[in-house]
């Protein structure tokens, strides 16, 4: 992991098209602004993990349903 030090209103650039700016610092909380193309999805990690878990759960349900449908079809 690359660790960088930035102060309020300072930025980093990723891949020529993503800019991350430190907007505010209050105690242990840091507010950041992200300027990126609309085609790039940006999520807080906890939300991303929830989405991944829901997608995995949905895929498992579909697989179970498909197996049952195939069993019924082959009868």
UniProtKB/Swiss-Prot annotation:
<dbReference type="GO" id="GO:0006402">
    <property type="term" value="P:mRNA catabolic process"/>
</dbReference>
<comment type="similarity">
    <text>Belongs to the CsrA/RsmA family.</text>
</comment>
<comment type="subunit">
    <text>Homodimer; the beta-strands of each monomer intercalate to form a hydrophobic core, while the alpha-helices form wings that extend away from the core.</text>
</comment>
<comment type="function">
    <text>A translational regulator that binds mRNA to regulate translation initiation and/or mRNA stability. Usually binds in the 5'-UTR at or near the Shine-Dalgarno sequence preventing ribosome-binding, thus repressing translation. Its main target seems to be the major flagellin gene, while its function is anatagonized by FliW.</text>
</comment>
<keyword id="KW-0694">RNA-binding</keyword>
<dbReference type="GO" id="GO:0048027">
    <property type="term" value="F:mRNA 5'-UTR binding"/>
</dbReference>
<dbReference type="InterPro" id="IPR003751">
    <property type="entry name" value="CsrA"/>
</dbReference>
<dbReference type="GO" id="GO:0044781">
    <property type="term" value="P:bacterial-type flagellum organization"/>
</dbReference>
<dbReference type="GO" id="GO:1902208">
    <property type="term" value="P:regulation of bacterial-type flagellum assembly"/>
</dbReference>
<keyword id="KW-1005">Bacterial flagellum biogenesis</keyword>
<dbReference type="GO" id="GO:0045947">
    <property type="term" value="P:negative regulation of translational initiation"/>
</dbReference>
<keyword id="KW-0963">Cytoplasm</keyword>
<keyword id="KW-0810">Translation regulation</keyword>
<dbReference type="Pfam" id="PF02599">
    <property type="entry name" value="CsrA"/>
</dbReference>
<protein>
    <recommendedName>
        <fullName>Translational regulator CsrA</fullName>
    </recommendedName>
</protein>
<dbReference type="GO" id="GO:0006109">
    <property type="term" value="P:regulation of carbohydrate metabolic process"/>
</dbReference>
<dbReference type="GO" id="GO:0005829">
    <property type="term" value="C:cytosol"/>
</dbReference>
<dbReference type="InterPro" id="IPR036107">
    <property type="entry name" value="CsrA_sf"/>
</dbReference>
<keyword id="KW-0678">Repressor</keyword>
